[in-house]
Regions:
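Beta1-alpha1 glycine-rich phosphate/pyrophosphate-binding loop at the start
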Residues: 3-86, 181-202
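Rossmann-like NAD(P)H-binding beta-loop-alpha module
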Residues: 154-203, 207
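FAD-binding core/adjacent interface of flavoenzyme oxidoreductases
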Residues: 2-21, 74-165, 169, 250-270, ...
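FAD-site-proximal beta/loop scaffold in flavoenzymes
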Residues: 141-162, 264, 269-338
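Mid-to-C-terminal Rossmann-like scaffold of FAD/NAD(P)H-dependent oxidoreductases
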Residues: 3, 13-16, 322-417
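Short beta-strand/turn micro-motifs composed of small residues
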Residues: 22, 47, 170, 193, ...
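Residue-level detector of alpha-helix initiation sites
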Residues: 24-28, 50, 132, 150, ...
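A Rossmann-like FAD-binding core segment of flavoenzymes
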Residues: 42, 83-115, 119, 185-304
Length: 418
């Protein structure tokens, strides 16, 4: 059930049960796992948005496929809540967690008053995800992100007016995937990164050089080794607002490192673009974990026990983008089902063998080049070539004991037969 009135929600949740904070893939996976084993235990799902169910990884492929946000939604939040028989508090912000009384304070984001409502819990699952990092040079009022379906929908609407020039800052997996998607949709794309090649924080130079060549061969402009210093409106002075440039943005950038002995270095001409997308990484909000006394790592998120996904705070679990295992952030979709099953068993008091975390296979969704990674990759390290040809590169990352800790396989796309 979906509840608009928080006073009703408080009485509905008076039976306590399970409270889940966050209605992304992780939160809904936990609900699915619990309901598969117990149809009676009360579950309250709290989310700052509508709680609609959709597959977030599809956002980096949807524009070229001409898919609207409504096409990606599998079920509205209220529909999904009714099906699962859970209490959904949509458009609701959690302001505090008291681990002693096992209560949360919430308020509505859809109503003008700031009245707080208290909801109790027996078990809590933090599934609040991670949010985009915006460096000071990328003001949020001018720069897009595609980490949420609502912002994706707003950007897509802007891109329907015809071919436009989009600058993407950050050439990790998401930025590189979005670049190809926008190009296929007919837009001009400039991809900017601090590193010399895409995916440089996870793969060695020999591998990333092939990715650079592939995306540039498509027509994507890649600016590697550059840092964006500012994004501003072209006509912030208020003049010429009727010109074609009225809504355009100026992107100032410079080489990350310059040769101090080179006195001939000239300032670079800024880019003039229609839109800027930030793909500069994710971070986890520390406020709620701190309030709950949950151990937190500012780099990787909420710290959990590897076998049970419990935090150090009694009766509180974490799952998905907001949590980390053994110092490594868990920001991939593939493990969510197994993580949710472990949490469900632990909450319900069922015997279970414990969660066995295995790094998921990572696939770049670009069609220009096939990139597949297994293990735990990192750019620095003892990477050894296993296979190398014009069409294929396979490299292994060896640890100190000469054991393989990661493998990257890069293949050129198959050429269609005439």
């Amino acid at each position: 059930m979906s509840v608009e009135n928080l006073s009703v929600a408080s009485s509905t949740a008076s039976k306590k049960g399970v409270v889940i904070i966050g209605a992304g893939l992780a939160g809904w996976h936990v609900i699915d796992a619990i309901r598969a084993k117990d149809t009676e235990i009360p579950i309250t799902l709290i989310t700052a948005d509508s709680g609609d169910r959709y597959h977030k990884p599809m956002l980096t492929m949807a524009i070229s496929q001409n898919k609207r946000a409504s096409d990606l939604v599998r079920a509205s939040g209220s529909e999904a809540a009714n099906t699962a028989e859970v209490t959904l508090l949509a458009n609701t912000q959690v302001t505090d967690i008291d681990p002693v009384s096992q209560t949360v304070q919430v308020c509505s984001t859809a109503q003008s008053d700031d009245a707080l409502t208290t909801i109790g819990y027996e078990k809590m699952v933090l599934a609040m995800g991670a949010h985009p990092i915006f460096p000071k040079s990328l003001p949020q009022d001018l720069v897009w992100h595609v980490n949420h379906i609502e912002r994706f929908s707003q950007l897509q609407e802007k891109l329907t007016t015809g071919s436009q020039h989009v600058a993407i800052v950050g050439a990790g997996m998401v930025g590189t995937e979005i670049a190809e998607d926008l190009l296929k949709a007919g837009h001009k794309v400039t991809l900017i990164d601090l590193n010399d090649a895409p995916l440089s924080q996870m793969l060695p130079a020999k591998a990333t050089a092939r990715i650079t060549k592939a995306i540039e061969s498509q027509g994507i402009q890649f600016l590697g080794g550059y840092q964006v210093s500012a994004v501003t409106r072209v006509n912030d002075d208020g003049n010429n607002n009727d010109s074609e440039d009225a809504e355009k943005l100026q992107v100032d950038y410079a080489p990350l490192s310059t040769n101090a002995d080179n006195t001939d270095t000239q300032p670079l001409e800024p880019l003039i673009v229609d839109h800027v997308i930030a793909s500069t990484g994710l971070t986890v909000d520390e406020q709620l974990p701190a309030a709950a006394g949950v151990e937190f790592d500012r780099r990787t998120g909420i710290v959990v026990d590897a076998a049970t996904l419990r935090t150090n705070a009694a009766n509180i679990y974490a799952i998905g983008d907001c949590m980390s295992i053994n110092g490594v952030a868990c920001r991939y979709v593939a493990p969510l089902r197994a993580q949710a099953a472990t949490i469900a068993d632990d909450i319900l008091g069922h015997e279970h063998s414990g969660y066995d975390h295995k790094p998921p296979m990572i696939r770049l969704k670009n069609k220009a080049i096939s990139v597949m990674v297994t293990g735990v990759p990192q750019a620095a390290g003892n990477w050894q070539v296993k296979t190398e040809s014009d069409d294929e590169l396979i490299m292994d990352l060896l640890d100190d004991n000469e054991a393989v800790s990661a493998t990257v396989t890069i293949k050129a796309p198959a050429v269609p037969k005439a």
